[in-house]
């Protein structure tokens, strides 16, 4: 038999202990309504002592908010918010160049840009009339763009001193040549050029049947320019315009189309093209179309180098340390386009009508048709007439009484205009009249 002690107490099972609420160590639990320290601090002002509980509640709330960890990093959260905002924004009617929702006609991923940002982007071409060029970042947003209607010129020029063949596409915007004064509506903020690099495929990267050079990309841009109705095309270097006397330093078999020059302390390259002179590729770029050039002169001509001075309507820009070997080629280019004569500047500005129209030749140097020649001739005649009117006004202001006071005053202009002294025929007639008088 089993005996149970009378003094043994039967243990009743206890429920599991309830865990105590976790108290945030950073949150200070407020004490009584008026601790002794507060009573002593506000002994002279009972109204302020009554408001201390409100300030304790506010501080407790702020400490509680600060102690809660963020669900994700701030940078990641910001990117997601930006992406959501851009995707939720409705697209403009008919599509928009700056809207990533607008589909591109051509896409080129991983393109290296140097201006306005030195970074790789996806290059996109939109071939509609309201299309243009845009760069897409890694997040899918449009980083920068330019409409076709705002494009002044597009160049495809070789990058000098490279072992592999590389080319820079240079887009000059309207009012972004870095030379001419800006119109008032731009408020001093000139549009920036766009430059990206194209590297020719070599070796295993060459695709059979495809042009490894920049030709296909240039043709795509040309197509878009035609669709937009700009009448422009991509300008390539042309040996008929200018080619350096020194071949490429890293590729002896290739012609060089540049001349190394300094603008101040910065070194760059001058390109003499069929539409003007471009200086690049570092900021600030400068593009001199023929209409903006008043005259071109030479300075500091030494045995090995010389300086080129380009005068515009508003300023004079000097490029230094040009190789003397390229002097003859540059001078031929200047003479060919009449850039050495400031008196022809008005005629050059008059020629700036339908400039850089699509030509039969790829380099854009083919002669215009008969209708364009007649229109251009009319503008030239107008410019000549304005110059003649100006000369006539100067002759009207001339004082004949001062002719004998200065030696040779006005003799050159009189000989050129044929309005001064007698020619040989007139002299013979005068002598004949004198003989008749004597008889």
UniProtKB/Swiss-Prot annotation:
Annotated SMART domains: Rtt106 (SM01287)
Main location group: nucleus
Annotated segments matching region Disordered: 66-99, 352-439
InterPro entries in the record: PH-like_dom_sf, RTT106/SPT16-like_middle_dom, RTT106/SSRP1_HistChap/FACT
Signal peptide region: none
Subunit organization: Interacts with histones H3 and H4.
Function: Histones H3 and H4 chaperone involved in the nucleosome formation and heterochromatin silencing. Required for the deposition of H3K56ac-carrying H3-H4 complex onto newly-replicated DNA. Plays a role in the transcriptional regulation of the cell-cycle dependent histone genes by creating a repressive structure at the core histone gene promoter.
The protein's name in its UniProt record: Histone chaperone RTT106
Native source organism of the sequence: Phaeosphaeria nodorum (strain SN15 / ATCC MYA-4574 / FGSC 10173)
């Amino acid at each position: 038999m089993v005996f149970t002690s009378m003094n043994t107490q039967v243990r009743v099972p206890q429920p599991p202990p309830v865990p105590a609420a976790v108290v945030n160590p950073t949150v200070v639990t407020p004490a009584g309504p008026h601790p002794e320290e507060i009573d002593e601090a506000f002994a002279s002002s009972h109204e302020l002592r009554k408001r201390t509980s409100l300030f304790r509640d506010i501080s407790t709330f702020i400490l509680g908010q600060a102690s809660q960890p963020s669900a994700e990093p701030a940078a990641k959260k910001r990117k997601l918010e930006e992406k959501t905002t851009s995707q939720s924004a409705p697209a403009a009617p008919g599509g928009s160049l700056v809207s990533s929702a607008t589909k591109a006609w051509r896409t080129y991923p991983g393109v290296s840009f140097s201006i306005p940002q030195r970074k790789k982007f996806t290059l996109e071409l939109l071939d509609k009339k309201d299309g243009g060029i845009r760069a897409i970042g890694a997040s899918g947003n449009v980083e920068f763009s330019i409409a076709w209607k705002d494009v002044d010129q597009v160049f495809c020029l070789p990058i000098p001193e490279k072992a592999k063949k590389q080319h820079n596409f240079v887009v000059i915007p309207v009012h972004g040549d870095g030379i001419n004064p800006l119109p008032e509506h731009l408020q001093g903020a000139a549009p920036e050029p766009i430059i990206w690099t194209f590297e020719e495929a070599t070796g295993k990267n060459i695709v059979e049947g495809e042009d490894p050079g920049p030709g296909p990309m240039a043709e795509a841009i040309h197509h878009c320019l035609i669709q937009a109705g700009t009448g422009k095309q991509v300008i390539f270097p042309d040996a008929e315009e200018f080619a350096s006397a020194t071949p490429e330093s890293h590729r002896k078999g290739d012609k060089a189309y540049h001349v190394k020059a300094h603008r101040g302390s910065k070194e760059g390259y001058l390109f003499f093209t069929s539409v003007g002179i471009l200086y690049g590729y570092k900021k600030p770029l400068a593009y001199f179309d023929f209409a903006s050039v008043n005259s071109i002169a030479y300075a500091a001509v030494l045995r090995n180098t010389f300086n080129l001075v380009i005068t515009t309507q508003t300023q004079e820009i000097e490029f230094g340390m040009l190789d003397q070997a390229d002097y003859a080629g540059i001078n031929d280019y200047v003479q060919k386009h009449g850039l050495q004569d400031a008196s022809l500047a008005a005629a050059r500005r008059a020629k700036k009508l339908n400039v850089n129209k699509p030509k039969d030749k790829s380099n854009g140097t083919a002669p215009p048709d008969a209708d364009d020649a007649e229109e251009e001739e009319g503008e030239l005649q107008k410019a000549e007439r304005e110059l003649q009117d100006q000369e006539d006004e100067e002759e009207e202001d001339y004082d004949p009484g001062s002719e004998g006071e200065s030696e040779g005053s006005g003799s050159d202009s009189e000989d050129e205009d044929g309005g001064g002294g007698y020619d040989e025929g007139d002299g013979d007639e005068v002598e004949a009249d004198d003989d008749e008088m004597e008889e």
